[in-house]
Design a protein with these regions (language model features):
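Glycoside hydrolase catalytic-domain context in secreted enzymes
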Residues: 33-723, 731-745, 757
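Extracellular and select intracellular beta-sandwich modules with Ser/Thr-enriched
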Residues: 747-751
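Bacterial Sec-dependent N-terminal signal peptides
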Residues: 1-44
Length: 758
């Protein structure tokens, strides 16, 4: 070490550039670490020895600084709690920043951290890149309806490349919360109601964001959120209490988080809700027992916005000081914008309520992730102006967004009206038809709409201005009917009507819960009048959740669920309406008939009084509505038709540790090329605890020309039959099973097999 110190003095005489000084410090730390890292022991694998050595050089204030995440004044996604972040970066008391982007701005903040703080530890820069950065893709719920894992991975990869090119190295995504309640506004950010599909998508998005190498400048750190159970608030009201059985929690809600962690995610965000009476941000059962111990999670845990502070309101701690103790001892490594760790954690350590070992473990996790991102080798790795100008919002990325949007749309109804014919006179009605902003949905990141087309503009561009007449008709909100007459006149002058209706973008997302799931305002009243003209009416829905559209489905001739389709969503809508692309999307959330059916999902239990005959009275049913949804999970139409036949099993019995194969023939019986999502469901007929009527266990997407057939096969293993049993062990139970393969959760062929004890 004496030689190293003398070498430092000599080289220091000619090191004039601050960045070089910092790099040299890291060189010294690296050499020193080679002699000391073997004496350390911790639960993490593959810890950078420089990180362990650096930890020994840090003061308590500097350690706590690494556990602090403050917002910049660049963009705000919540109430600003603290504004002196620049001085705190200099003092080593803030190690992470969010809501900042562009290479110029981030380079300057990074310069302050690296060149003006004592140890020069680089900053993490996070942002809500939820469904794109500059190029905005369809909202995640829409993307999930593509059932296309490679496409979803690709869209996350494009988002990561653009974010990284803008200086960012961390996204607060993916949201993997399962939800069966469309009243909850944040369903638009997730993958729907199914744990198997949700797990596949969670893994695909993590891999898309993080790529093959976190230090690759086309990748960013993913953040699996919101851990855990955030998608199940009572009454669908955001931030509300979550109360469910441990079995339901483990069977349905936990799997996507586990899939994200297994895919390599190195940050996990806590949720606002409580679980089993304890807020998730202070819940050691979730954060330590499950995440860090059972799952061997290698990354760090960050809170959601001020959720440590909010534990005071939950009533589990008397003040924010005690909240800091509860959070850090439960396993929270980083405080997002709460200023609680910043204000109180040092005092709590000095008082003995928090151990230095707890602090060290948290800081070690954070610093190790920074190392994995390559920030210790090059703090400005993500600050390349040339890359920013060439990648962000490129034509190539926009084309990917258009492809994702086309594959995410779901054709809900079509009475031989679609596809439209070019040259027909089209009346376009609805305020949403002329809106660009609404196409982006919530969490638009750096997305802009100035260079986008509205659905109206895209229709004019494709069909010609002389063949399109527009009337707003009514606003998307409110009860003004003064434009109805002009809309009816426009409809009467046209061959067909395209009516664009749905939700304002701000009515979906965080803090956007609803008690009425109908189309807002008087849009549906206008639709009924337009349909009464006798002209064929095509409804295009722009929304972020399943809506109750039974009324609309009765009067419209065709309904296309376009969701919030993103930067090139308008062009994608036109592609589908005119048959340039044959729709193939399938619903990943059930569409209820009315809000009284909510929560509603396909994997319900049979109950002791299932319905066998429609008029039976003392059964589990409603007096005023069928139990069945309007549109079930897995449903979606095409411009062609597919026939399922010849379901076969390779064996009627499945032995433990072995597998059987289920196969079905799918034939394109229509006149167009099309893609079909073939779905596999399994039912466990008798269990030690009650089991769902079916659960999705596999799917495949096939592409067929007219008249073409293909045999689709699924391998069924014992693992696919496993669940949390009566004694809360995980595994399969011997017995009889139904296997169902088909085009949706309620339209399948069925066969049976038996799982033996041996």
């Amino acid at each position: 070490m004496k030689c190293i110190c003398r070498l430092s003095e000599c080289i220091g005489k000619w090191l004039k550039v601050s960045v070089m000084r910092r790099l040299f410090v890291w060189f010294v730390i690296s050499v020193a670490a080679l002699t000391s890292c073997g004496n350390k022991s911790n639960k993490l694998r593959d810890v950078d020895p420089r990180v362990e050595s650096l930890l020994n050089e840090m003061t308590l204030d500097e350690k706590i600084g690494q556990m602090v995440l403050f917002t910049s004044d660049w963009d705000v996604t919540g109430p600003t709690m603290y504004e002196g972040y620049l001085e705190d970066i200099r003092n080593g008391r803030c190690g992470n920043i969010f809501n900042a982007y562009t290479t110029d701005y981030i380079r300057e903040l990074q310069r302050v951290a690296v060149e003006e703080s004592r140890l020069g530890i680089p900053l993490l820069f996070g942002y809500d890149v939820v469904h794109g950065h500059k190029t905005i893709f369809p909202v995640p719920l829409a993307e999930s309806c593509s059932w296309d894992m490679e496409l979803i991975r690709q869209s996350a990869g494009v988002a990561a490349a653009e974010a990284a090119a803008s200086g960012l190295n961390w996204t607060f995504a993916p949201m993997v919360d399962i939800s069966v309640d469309p009243r909850w506004g944040r369903v638009c950010e997730g993958a729907g109601e199914d744990p198997y599909l949700g797990s596949q998508i969670a893994a695909a998005r993590v891999k898309g964001f993080q790529g093959n190498d976190l230090a690759d400048t086309l990748s960013v750190l993913a953040c699996v959120k919101h851990f855990a159970g955030y998608g199940a608030p009572i009454a669908g009201r955001d931030y509300n209490t979550v109360d469910m059985s441990e079995r339901m929690f483990r069977d349905v809600y936990l799997p996507p988080y586990k899939a994200g962690v297994d895919a390599g995610a190195l940050s996990v965000m806590t949720s606002f809700n409580e679980y089993d009476g304890v807020p998730a941000t202070g819940n050691s059962y979730l954060l330590k027992d499950i995440l860090k111990n059972q799952w061997k999670y290698q990354g760090f845990v960050v809170t959601d916005y001020t959720s440590i502070n909010e534990m005071v309101h939950h009533g589990v701690v008397p003040d924010e000081a005690e909240a800091s103790v509860l959070a850090v001892n439960a396993g929270v490594d980083m405080d997002l914008q709460g200023v609680v760790y910043f204000n109180y954690l040092k005092t709590m350590v000095e008082s003995g309520k928090v151990s230095t070992r707890t602090i060290d473990e948290a800081v070690l996790r954070i610093l190790n992730v920074k190392s994995r991102l390559g920030l210790f080798d090059n703090p400005y790795l993500y600050c390349d102006k040339e890359r920013e100008q060439s990648i962000v919002g490129s034509m190539q990325n926009m084309q990917v967004a258009r492809e994702v949007a086309r594959k995410s749309m779901v054709l809900l109804k079509n009475d031989e009206v679609l596809p439209l014919k070019k040259g027909e006179r089209i009346a376009v009605i609805g305020e949403l038809a002329s809106s660009k902003r609404d196409l982006l949905g919530s969490w638009k990141a750096a997305g802009e709409w100035d260079d986008m087309k509205s659905v109206l503009e895209a229709l004019v561009a494709y069909n010609g201005a002389s063949n399109v007449v527009y009337a707003e008709g009514c606003k998307k909100m409110g009860d003004d009917r003064s434009g109805f007459l002009s809309a009816l006149l426009a409809a009467q002058s046209a061959d067909k009507v395209v009516m664009v209706i749905g939700e304002d973008w701000d009515w979906s997302g965080e803090a956007a819960s609803r008690t009425d799931l109908g189309v807002p305002g008087v849009q549906s009243d206008l639709l009924e009048l337009v349909a009464a003209t006798g002209k064929p009416v095509v409804v295009v829905l722009l929304n972020g959740r399943p809506l109750t559209i039974e009324r609309e489905s009765q009067v419209a001739d065709a309904i296309l669920e376009a969701w919030y389709p993103g930067s090139r969503g308008a062009e994608a809508v036109v592609d589908v309406l005119y048959g340039e692309y044959n729709p193939s999307g399938k619903l990943t959330m059930t569409f209820p008939r009315n809000v009284g059916q909510v929560p509603i999902y396909y994997y319900e239990k049979n109950t002791g009084r299932p319905i066998y005959l429609p008029n039976e009275k003392y059964k589990s049913k409603y007096l005023d509505s069928p139990n069945t949804p309007l549109y079930p999970f897995g449903y979606g139409l095409s411009y062609t038709t597919f026939e399922y036949s010849d379901l076969k099993l390779s064996s009627p019995g499945l032995k433990k540790g072995k597998s059987i194969v289920a196969s079905v023939t799918v034939t394109n019986t229509g006149a167009r090329y099309g893609e079909e999502i073939v779905q596999l469901y399994i039912r466990d007929l008798v269990g030690s605890v009650t089991r769902p009527v079916k659960m999705l266990k596999g799917f495949q997407k096939v592409a067929l020309s007219p008249g073409e057939s293909v045999q689709v096969s699924f391998v069924i293993t014992e693992d696919m039959l496993s669940f949390w049993r009566k004694d809360m062990t995980f595994g399969a139970e011997p017995g009889d099973f139904h296997v169902m393969i088909g085009r949706s959760s309620d339209d399948t062929l069925q066969a049976s097999f038996n799982l033996s004890r041996k």
